[in-house]
Amino acid sequence: MWVSVEDDLFNSIYNKLKSNPIVQNELDGRVFDSVQKDAVYPYIVVGESNVTNNESSVSMTEDVGLTLHVYSQAVNAHETRELIKFLGLILNREIKLNNYEFIRSRIDDQQVITDIDQYTKHGIIRLLFKYRHTTKY
């Protein structure tokens, strides 16, 4: 039986952001796993994920898509764009995980929109990671 890399990758990215000195300085560590009610802006949400696996009798690889969101109420979208760019720079690279071999990562999509309240700037970046399993359970 193979155990998905999804949870380990999600937790690693979440913890990497929470402990990042730039996130600590600029956002006071405001990284969450869901949208916040009565939030202090800006903040980051490590959000939705999906997994596509390719299993054979002797190996397993997974493509994991992970979407991150940035919310800002700055006057313009510059802050949001800068934070999205920052997320791409620090996360679009190898993330070492026990029992999994990193193959590649890439930015699948990124965009900045204005939320329905017409004030909140919402940045979205979707990253794709490919891992090979090194352990079968």
Predicted regions, residues:
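Short, charged interaction patches at domain edges and termini
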Residues: M1-K16, V51-D63, E101-Y137
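Small/polar-rich, solvent-exposed N-terminal microdomains that initiate assembly or binding
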Residues: M1-N50, E82, L89, N98, ...
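Polar helix-capping/helix-linker motif
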Residues: S19-N20, R93-E94, K121
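Short, solvent-exposed beta-alpha or beta-beta edge segments that form flexible loop/patches at the rim
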Residues: L27-A74, R106-Q111, L128
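Mid-chain, well-packed structural core segment of small domains
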Residues: S72-R93
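Short, flexible active-site-proximal loops enriched in glycine and acidic residues
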Residues: I95-E101
